[in-house]
Amino acid sequence: MNQNTTEPVAATETLAEVPEHVLRGLPEEVRLFPSAVDKTRIGVWATKPILKGKKFGPFVGDKKKRSQVKNNVYMWEVYYPNLGWMCIDATDPEKGNWLRYVNWACSGEEQNLFPLEINRAIYYKTLKPIAPGEELLVWYNGEDNPEIAAAIEEERASARSKRSSPKSRKGKKKSQENKNKGNKIQDIQLKTSEPDFTSANMRDSAEGPKEDEEKPSASALEQPATLQEVASQEVPPELATPAPAWEPQPEPDERLEAAACEVNDLGEEEEEEEEEDEEEEEDDDDDELEDEGEEEASMPNENSVKEPEIRCDEKPEDLLEEPKTTSEETLEDCSEVTPAMQIPRTKEEANGDVFETFMFPCQHCERKFTTKQGLERHMHIHISTVNHAFKCKYCGKAFGTQINRRRHERRHEAGLKRKPSQTLQPSEDLADGKASGENVASKDDSSPPSLGPDCLIMNSEKASQDTINSSVVEENGEVKELHPCKYCKKVFGTHTNMRRHQRRVHERHLIPKGVRRKGGLEEPQPPAEQAQATQNVYVPSTEPEEEGEADDVYIMDISSNISENLNYYIDGKIQTNNNTSNCDVIEMESASADLYGINCLLTPVTVEITQNIKTTQVPVTEDLPKEPLGSTNSEAKKRRTASPPALPKIKAETDSDPMVPSCSLSLPLSISTTEAVSFHKEKSVYLSSKLKQLLQTQDKLTPAGISATEIAKLGPVCVSAPASMLPVTSSRFKRRTSSPPSSPQHSPALRDFGKPSDGKAAWTDAGLTSKKSKLESHSDSPAWSLSGRDERETVSPPCFDEYKMSKEWTASSAFSSVCNQQPLDLSSGVKQKAEGTGKTPVQWESVLDLSVHKKHCSDSEGKEFKESHSVQPTCSAVKKRKPTTCMLQKVLLNEYNGIDLPVENPADGTRSPSPCKSLEAQPDPDLGPGSGFPAPTVESTPDVCPSSPALQTPSLSSGQLPPLLIPTDPSSPPPCPPVLTVATPPPPLLPTVPLPAPSSSASPHPCPSPLSNATAQSPLPILSPTVSPSPSPIPPVEPLMSAASPGPPTLSSSSSSSSSSSSFSSSSSSSSPSPPPLSAISSVVSSGDNLEASLPMISFKQEELENEGLKPREEPQSAAEQDVVVQETFNKNFVCNVCESPFLSIKDLTKHLSIHAEEWPFKCEFCVQLFKDKTDLSEHRFLLHGVGNIFVCSVCKKEFAFLCNLQQHQRDLHPDKVCTHHEFESGTLRPQNFTDPSKAHVEHMQSLPEDPLETSKEEEELNDSSEELYTTIKIMASGIKTKDPDVRLGLNQHYPSFKPPPFQYHHRNPMGIGVTATNFTTHNIPQTFTTAIRCTKCGKGVDNMPELHKHILACASASDKKRYTPKKNPVPLKQTVQPKNGVVVLDNSGKNAFRRMGQPKRLNFSVELSKMSSNKLKLNALKKKNQLVQKAILQKNKSAKQKADLKNACESSSHICPYCNREFTYIGSLNKHAAFSCPKKPLSPPKKKVSHSSKKGGHSSPASSDKNSNSNHRRRTADAEIKMQSMQTPLGKTRARSSGPTQVPLPSSSFRSKQNVKFAASVKSKKPSSSSLRNSSPIRMAKITHVEGKKPKAVAKNHSAQLSSKTSRSLHVRVQKSKAVLQSKSTLASKKRTDRFNIKSRERSGGPVTRSLQLAAAADLSENKREDGSAKQELKDFSYSLRLASRCSPPAAPYITRQYRKVKAPAAAQFQGPFFKE
């Protein structure tokens, strides 16, 4: 465009005269001010740094013939194959866009832009970096400038490669086009504008005269030749030469057209294929037109081929900008330019179109045709316009028929609808071979595609209006304008074809026809207005127009290389929602999102978002200006520092476009907030398939938690972290922006991604494995770093994994959050801390989960990418420490990723090991830069800050993080985590420095998460600042703790937290109860972990904070102690909060505490912190652990912090005694609360006798606390839900609902089906204490009781898995686990009470089965579990009768380990101990156990082996389950089975027999044969045989028709709830184990009976176990049937299973009735 042409504008231009659409279209980097070069003109000035290579455009204007151009200053001449040289004239500001104001450079020194033609659209590309305050000056250097020449050449080469394939088709299509002129007419109109783009060669040739005058360079002369040359090449050389011309120059039309042309190439082929049947003629026409257009575009494409990337990059902005100007300019441009295009430039057209001899010019428009036929065909357009009287309501285009008009209007509508989807197109284009040139077009069109319809329509309207002079049809009568499909970027010659294609191919499934049409009409209307307003403006596509209308359309200068943006999009980094465009580190607008197809992912709100984005983007992106990655990283850090301000700022921004400021962080946070607030604007938070997968994975991991989490994710992610994940997690971008550390969705998603490296792959291809590198990369590539997901995943995938689970829980608890409460078992506070993370049902839990997160980080990370994380070593260490726990955690608590990490990280530092361990181990891998941070960060606030910055930086920008935080703030829990994050920094300062390091290492992930956001935004910045503000590291922790610890609400009020922390805290505090702040603190404490597993990290951090700042929370004064505790928690090492001495176990610590007994007489039994003042301890216990009144068992004087635990205890241990309890008011201390045991006893005697366990305080803690915790867990896990509120914390404790641990505590609901722990937990397990709770058994630290419960379940369930049946993926009993999956759902929940007491091992089997089936636990874990379980079972076998007795009445006295004589209150504890932790236990029992498992379920070893083969695994699992259920009698029976291998061959057959049993017992033998053949595994056969044996006995014992009927009915119901059934079976089996053992033995001796008899017997046992026995038996039968089904051929099995069930149910019920009676 010859802007500086000698012809000055008639009058001096003023800003007041600048059309609104121009201002709207201004990119945020530039502003209009009077030019310094030409005083009479307005100039474009950079307000922000503009990187070299950035493109602006396309240049918008009217297409005119050279003769029509009055002022060369504002025009570019472009060669169109059909029309020859046409001028894109923007002399009329209303017809142009802001590029018209870019003045001509007077010298090469001044020049910073050069024109680039892409698809006949002129773009301005930055020739060199432009600093703020510089005026953008463009000049066409032609090929003189090597850089420009190279850029143009690249464009050309790209265009050529693109053209090659489509051209061949074009020739074919042209012939067809001639045949279909009617369609072509529309195409012509549409193409009329498009060709303009094509001709938009920056040739000054047409302008030459004036330009030459104005710019005495030879460019004018040179340009025509070049253009001609280019024309021959299909890409005007000049434009090609200007390839570097940046976005400022290109016109939207040109750009869109370029996209259209390229798209046409692709689209034509596809379109033809897709729509050939329906639209063959039209398509042919269109294709011909498109082909011509493509050919035309091809030339530019050559030039633009290179640009496409840039386009992708810039397209969003460009498109956004274009739309407005384009819409205005397109119509006029179309009409005017069309004539120009018509100007027959007898230049050989690369396409070979005959331009040279346009013998037949159109009298209505300037199009000329080489053939009369072409002209006639073309005339249809005008005729329809004249006759018709059906005008498009959007663009006014006239049609001869209502049908045609409606078809045309649908395009507009589709354009409106597709706007969001269009974002995907660019990426698709990029992916396509056309990626370069076409991509450029696509990118431009991505927004324009949506706009495209309008734009095209506008063009059509323009054509119709200007029909007389503007229906540009190719010689053949083909319309040159290309109409790219928004969805697939296919290019069509006509809007009609494009719309038809869209409707048929893309929209059909999306919208009912009626709706589509209606919706389309409605949507396009606004564009129609625009179109009308800018009818004459030449715009390549209406869609950009629409978008432009919707919002500021400023060319999006996505980072210089589009590929990065695409990568974001492809990697899922770009959030695909309104915020996504902003989210992009690159300043992507909705248009850009469209470009990347993000809009589709996000929502069709792109337009609005665009405006918001613009506004938001400007502030946020200002921080992260054009630097797509690096800048963002820095910005993130900056934001982090300024997080408090950024938070508010971003908050507002986040509302409009939370993701804009800090893509990664903002997205996650905003999504998280979305749940609460942040994403309010993002009504449609898109949950990417990855996120969904993540959520699903989480669901698998935490069935209970996922529902809430998913809701949170979907909602918050739409709603929460998961919500944030929706947008952010959906893609890298999405995740970055949407998932704050606190946001469960994001975090879980991240975590999930982290877990399955592949899930991350999309977002973080090497997310897990390369987390460290990514973190490191974060610094390198801010965008990626910024991508919250990347960071989260990268930084703390394990934590994130845990966070995912935890976050899910948190999401559901934090966001659904006020009721989810997990049993708070004060018993093992410290351990819980470590374990809590895995649980991290809520952010509060997260706080407790601090340690757990570490462990989980290591565990999960180890699982996910053992290769790259020391975390794995941690995991190993954790496993070593508590193989059972670790395994259980993995199996039951994938969410507990950080549980063991703390232990592993002891090396990092006493504090570091606990939370930092995972962080450091994991950060090192995850956090390139952050990896080092963990220890250092923790050690020093600066380090923490760096970590946090790293976290935030990875999250995109701390600024965005704050926004995320802010959104998170709206969702109280997420904010809390951020606050916690703030708290974390101080803890890092404290001995827990490693924890902050984890924050930093995990922080990137946390950033995505609310925590991360908080950390990055407020907490982290605060971390640095706050740490400073804090009097001392401990004080900071204390303040944080005070803020977080004092209670979630305190969080908000915590002054200690930095302003950002407090502001965040306040927001979060106000929105969420006190527990969330704890989680916030936790998140602060372990930002890194939070980043990785936002909530879990939060939990982790909370835990750290709680450990470290537990007292501070309760009593800031003990912040130092807290810190010690925190260190303790963070490290597997237990730290004395008085002297900070680390200890490997709670026992050691407990022994050590006696040293401080004098000075510190009081001790927290949960977190083992010492207190000088009883009131402090009481406050601490109450605030952190939720311990209010103490309940003492009247029988054994055991004290319980929670009545539900006491009741469970009494049920378990004193079933035959009339139990009452004493209740001591809150503040009453238990014997465990005294540092000096003797003193404790004495003082406690006042209230009541001290627990016998008190002699060994450590043991007591372990047993008593564990017992209580176990009791709680049992209550939760057992179907026996206490009728009371059974809030673990107390009846009157109402804490923010913490999601239940990953595994679910099950209680029976009225249906008799185990209710998920979530349900139970939600109501009964409030967990507000974010105290550093340690597992008394393994010393693992947990931040909250829910985490502790999770850990205990993991720790204790390792051996008592049967008892708790907390599975890796807790499947709600309601969600019956399908036997074929081998997942014995936590069926034992219903039977948990009994099994728990006497046969927790059985649950282990079921858990193992579920784990195996889920394949989540590795074979090793399963094997270990099985071995442990087997060991426990062996023990049980030894004491089978004892167990039976215990079931009936658990021995009040402790159970003694046969190996080491250690006493245990619960048989479950003993079993766990014997199975996993007994140091003296011989190896043989495990072997026996294995054999037993083989015999019983054959799943322990068989399942493990079968794990490789799902079918076999399922079968074996089913067998195992069957064995467990039918043969869950003590090991003795299992042994009997193994001893009776003859029956082993019958297992499969037994299954079938079982199925057929209803038919006849005799069938059994038959089925056994086939079954045996199928399930050759002797174990199965043995199982079945045993089961059958049982059944006969059961049958002999009794047959109750009622039970059978009940069973059959239940079976049907349970068939639906196979999982629940399996669980029930497992539990029943466990309960029945002892009885069955005897019965089974008898049955065995009696001889194997039909499967039905065995099943019946098993059912009888279960029924005897409880009234639900019949239902359970049904479940059991059902499970068995399911197993059989899985074993048997899938088709027959189900049917047989049902029949079998029906028959078997009655029989079994009959048998069971007697059994139960027995």
Swiss-Prot record:
Q: Residue numbers of motif SH3-binding?
A: 970-979, 985-998, 1028-1052
Renumbered to this chain, the Polar residues biased-composition regions fall at 189-202, 1525-1556, 1599-1608
Spans annotated as Disordered? 155-335, 405-457, 513-550, 622-660, 729-797, 903-1083, 1244-1265, 1478-1576, 1589-1612, 1625-1652
- Record-listed E.C. numbers: 2.1.1.355
* One Gene Ontology biological process: regulation of DNA-templated transcription
Which SUPFAM superfamilies does the record associate with it? beta-beta-alpha zinc fingers, SET domain
Which intervals hold domain SET? 28-141
**Cellular compartment(s):** Nucleus
Q: Where is this cross-link: Glycyl lysine isopeptide (Lys-Gly) (interchain with G-Cter in SUMO2)?
A: K347, K651, K690, K692, K774, K866, K879, K1147, K1151, K1257, K1281
Q: In which tissues is it expressed?
A: Highly expressed in retinoblastoma cell lines and in brain tumors. Also expressed in a number of other cell lines and in brain, heart, skeletal muscle, liver and spleen. Isoform 1 is expressed in testis at much higher level than isoform 3.
- Give me the Gene Ontology terms describing cellular component: Golgi apparatus; nucleoplasm; nucleus
Which ranges of the sequence are coiled-coil?
none
Compositional bias segments (type: Acidic residues): 265-297, 1251-1265
Q: Which family does it belong to?
A: Belongs to the class V-like SAM-binding methyltransferase superfamily.
Cross-referenced PANTHER family, in alphabetical order?
PR DOMAIN ZINC FINGER PROTEIN (PTHR16515), PR DOMAIN ZINC FINGER PROTEIN 2 (PTHR16515:SF37)
**What's the name of the protein?**
PR domain zinc finger protein 2
Species, as recorded: Homo sapiens (Human)
